[in-house]
Amino acid sequence: MPSKARNIAGRPIGRVETRDWIYLAIIIAFGGSSFAMIRGAVETIPPAVIAVSRLWIGAAVLCAFVVAKRRKFPKFLAPGENGPRLHRAWGSMLAVGVVGNTVPFFIFPWAQQYVDSGLAGIYMAFMPIWTLGLGFLFADESITPQKVVGFGLGFVGVVILMGPDAMSGAASASTLAQAAMLFAAFLYAGSAVLARRAPPVRPRVYAAGVLLCAAVAATPSLFFVDFASDQWSLTSILCVIGLGVFPTGLNAFVIVALIRRAGAGFMALANYLTPLWAVLLGAAIYAERLSLSTFLALGVILIGVFVTQRRPAPQSDLDNASLHPDSAAAHRNLADNAVDDGK
């Protein structure tokens, strides 16, 4: 018997619609463009400054949308048995912000000093695999044969895209750096599942809170950085602004919205297509050469995505109990915590 659970869009969970594919395409475009912008930013600006700046810019963009739409953030503190405590919504936003933004944003610049970008792309392809397992364990997202085969094909496609040189580089690259990249991919997956289980807060408000928390947590790192701001070029500054507005700010809202509509597993498919988009964008902007393996990888990845979505899997009612505003759990959360859902 099919599940009657419905998501925040008011439709059965597991049904992927046209808007979800549009959201996925936006995530891929923003995420893939970040590599080109990072390349321009790091030419004259320290990585830590880039990480903190893009978080604050992204938070400012989303907060501006929140104010323009006259939405409200939930109260920071909520009454508890032993006195005021951190509001449940803010606790969730803090966890997702630190786990999915602050820590990975610092891990990758450090690790890429010892691991080339091709190998980094392969390790990022572990994120959907982590998400598949974590979603099954903690978010009631089913594991089906179609998903296993599709996610496996997606991973193979990324390996083909990056080429044999990336795989051979694993032997000479720092073991600690490679482990750090795997851990960062795990954190991204964990943050996606945490966002899936978030209290019923509007996606725009939730995404703004996530970036605010991430920016605050990341800011102390600037005390240990040599700014050398007199060496910053206009191109690098514009790249940082672009990183903050698009891959960090607007992308955060789209990611949260897509996770709540279609699930963490579907959103994670972007990690298979983002490296491909980055390669194509690099060819367009930096005249990087496209090889036959690029088009072979495209075919394998697209087949993998098709297989994962060939037969939507039913989900349990628990999957979206805390996300659907009309659910009993949502009403209990709203009553207990006075979360503003933006209505």
Describe each PLM feature range.
Residues 37, 62, 131-133, 137, ...:
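Transmembrane alpha-helical segments that form core, pore/gating elements
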